[in-house]
């Protein structure tokens, strides 16, 4: 493609830094596979030195994904770079992304280093990273608040050292579009060897301007944008991949570049990330929200019926919405089930996983007349999640009576041993959670509890999301069922398993 715009997805690294959005290794692999199908150019799989879990996630994604460049973040430290290089050994194509802070406040207060020392360390880091891969990215952290003369100096030095991508982060989301675009254009114009590297933008959404700032960067010469599915990320989030990609593609009259992204997988990627992290997509979210292509006003409806382009600037099916989706039911066979999952971008590593998902599908079909794509994705997500859980919900019995306390009896399998507990309290969900907690012995603080319907109708699957805090660690749990209390129990158990898996998890840096 002439004048290609590179898409660098950091959902698995920066996106995971959203409180409660921590992902297991297997969940990261599932998301990475969808990103690969979307033809994402670079997947930042994690921060290898942060923990054993992060190292294994980067290593596994590097071994599984073949068609995207796999990247690991590292500070400008020898130990970080060596760890990243080791984790990326199995990658078909790899990149090391190293960074150091360049703003006055960061250099003085955090690093306690002089500008000369910072340049020296950045150059040394790039040269060390080149031992492992020819594809090295350098980021001057907090570039948005850094002195431009110093930025030019350190960028020139790191390009001379071998950096092939220079990423300019607006770490705290402080810039506005015109300002950020001018910065990108100025840096490209002032750095003597800028033609030897691709310039990139990494914007945060603290002022709601991440996508706008990134687009401004593209208009001013950036040819890589770092983004996340659903705009997931620290604080207010990052540049939304789906919004960035479709803005560039829809406004080809303004942008003289395009991406290789297969946009038909955007919706399935959005739903998978939402399901894994528990961060529900707001209905009015651009591109992937439930109302993104809905028209209620009579004049709008009439216009769309007569000629779609009167009120729609994109086709819904281009990003994965299927107006003529196949509705499955109790009489649908295994092949139709498998074919539909494939169309949704869902794959299983073995027949056992497919068989388990099909069994759950049949169980749901006995309770629900029509099963839609959203139901299938929820079922598959639950199937793939439970395969590696140490705590499993065996059964739940709840007794309720108006004006009386509710009783919940829970049977859990903990390390393959069944245990039973009963709790009595004013609420059925509360009683269920108390009974579960009494069996696990894990002290949990419930920070968030939300319920939503996966599809329409009184027989719809209910999706419950919980956010749990344990010893300062925040995780999300998700469960689906036609019964809300059962879905709540599944979500709570899912969260507890994440708590167990998240021990010794290190804190990630901000860029």
From Swiss-Prot:
Homodimer. Its cofactor is Mn(2+). Residues 392-511 are annotated as: Regulatory domain. The keyword tRNA-binding does not apply. Its main location: cytoplasm. Residues 5-267 form the Pyruvate carboxyltransferase domain. Its EC number is 2.3.3.13. SUPFAM superfamilies: 2-isopropylmalate synthase LeuA, allosteric (dimerisation) domain (SSF110921), Aldolase (SSF51569). It is found in: Cytoplasm. It is an enzyme of class 2 (transferase). This is 2-isopropylmalate synthase. Pathway: Amino-acid biosynthesis; L-leucine biosynthesis; L-leucine from 3-methyl-2-oxobutanoate: step 1/4. InterPro entries: 2-IPM_HCS-like (IPR050073), 2-isopropylmalate_synth_dimer (IPR013709), AIPM/Hcit_synth_CS (IPR002034), Aldolase_TIM (IPR013785), LeuA/HCS_post-cat (IPR054691), LeuA_allosteric_dom_sf (IPR036230), LeuA_bact_synth (IPR005671), PYR_CT (IPR000891). Catalyzes the condensation of the acetyl group of acetyl-CoA with 3-methyl-2-oxobutanoate (2-ketoisovalerate) to form 3-carboxy-3-hydroxy-4-methylpentanoate (2-isopropylmalate). Gene3D superfamilies: 3.30.160.270, Aldolase class I. GO terms for molecular function: 2-isopropylmalate synthase activity; acetyl-CoA C-acetyltransferase activity; manganese ion binding. It catalyses: 3-methyl-2-oxobutanoate + acetyl-CoA + H2O = (2S)-2-isopropylmalate + CoA + H(+). Keywords: Amino-acid biosynthesis, Branched-chain amino acid biosynthesis, Cytoplasm, Leucine biosynthesis, Manganese, Metal-binding, Transferase. The gene is leuA. GO terms for biological process: L-leucine biosynthetic process. One of its GO terms (cellular component) is cytosol. Belongs to the alpha-IPM synthase/homocitrate synthase family. LeuA type 1 subfamily. Pfam families: HCS_D2, HMGL-like, LeuA_dimer. Mn(2+) binds at residues 14, 202, 204, 238.
């Amino acid at each position: 493609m002439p004048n290609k715009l590179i898409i660098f997805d950091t959902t698995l690294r920066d996106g995971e830094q959203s409180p409660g959005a921590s992902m297991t290794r297997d969940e990261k692999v599932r998301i990475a596979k969808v990103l690969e199908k979307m033809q994402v150019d670079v997947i930042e799989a994690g921060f290898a030195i942060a923990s054993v879990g992060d190292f294994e996630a980067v290593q596994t994604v590097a071994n599984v994904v073949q068609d995207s460049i796999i990247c690991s973040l590292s500070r400008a430290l020898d130990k970080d770079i060596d760890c990243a290089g080791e984790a990326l050994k199995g990658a078909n194509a790899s990149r090391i992304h190293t960074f150091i802070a360049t703003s006055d406040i960061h250099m003085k207060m955090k690093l306690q280093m002089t500008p000369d020392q910072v340049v020296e360390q950045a150059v040394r880091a790039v040269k060390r990273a080149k031992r492992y891969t020819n594809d090295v990215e350098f980021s001057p952290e907090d570039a948005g608040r850094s002195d431009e003369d110093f930025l030019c100096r350190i960028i020139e030095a790191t390009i001379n050292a071998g950096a092939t991508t220079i990423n300019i982060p607006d770490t705290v989301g402080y810039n506005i579009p015109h300002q950020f675009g001018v910065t990108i254009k100025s840096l490209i114009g002032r750095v003597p060897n800028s033609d030897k590297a691709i310039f990139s933008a990494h914007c945060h959404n603290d002022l709601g301007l991440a996508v706008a700032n990134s687009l401004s960067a593209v208009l001013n010469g950036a040819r890589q944008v770092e983004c996340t599915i659903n705009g997931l990320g620290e604080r207010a989030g990052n540049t939304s991949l789906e919004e960035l990609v479709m803005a560039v593609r829809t406004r080809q009259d303004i942008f003289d570049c395009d991406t290789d992204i297969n946009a038909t997988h955007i919706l399935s990627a959005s739903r998978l990330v939402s399901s894994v992290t528990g961060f529900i997509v707001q209905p009015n979210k651009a591109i992937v929200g439930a109302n993104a292509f809905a028209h209620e006003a009579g004049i709008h409806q009439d216009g769309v019926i007569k000629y779609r382009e009167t009120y729609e600037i994109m086709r819904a099916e281009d990003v994965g919405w299927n107006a003529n989706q196949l509705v499955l039911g109790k009489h649908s066979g295994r092949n139709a089930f498998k074919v539909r999952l494939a169309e949704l971008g869902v794959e299983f590593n073995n027949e056992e996983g497919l068989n388990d998902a099909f069994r759950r599908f049949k169980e749901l079909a006995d309770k629900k007349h029509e099963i839609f794509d959203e139901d299938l994705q929820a079922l598959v997500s639950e199937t793939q999640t439970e395969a590696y859980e140490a705590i499993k919900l065996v059964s739940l019995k709840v007794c309720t009576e108006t004006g009386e306390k509710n009783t919940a009896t829970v049977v859990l399998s903990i390390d393959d041993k069944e245990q039973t507990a009963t709790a009595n309290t004013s609420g059925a969900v509360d009683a269920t959670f108390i009974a579960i907690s009494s069996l696990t012995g894990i002290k949990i603080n419930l920070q968030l509890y939300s319920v939503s319907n996966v599809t329409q109708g009184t027989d719809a699957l209910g999706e419950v999301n919980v956010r749990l805090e344990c010893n300062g660690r925040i995780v999300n749990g998700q469960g689906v069922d036609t019964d809300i209390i059962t879905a709540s129990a599944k979500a709570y158990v899912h969260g507890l398993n994440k708590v167990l898996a998240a021990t010794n998890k290190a804190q990630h840096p901000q860029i």
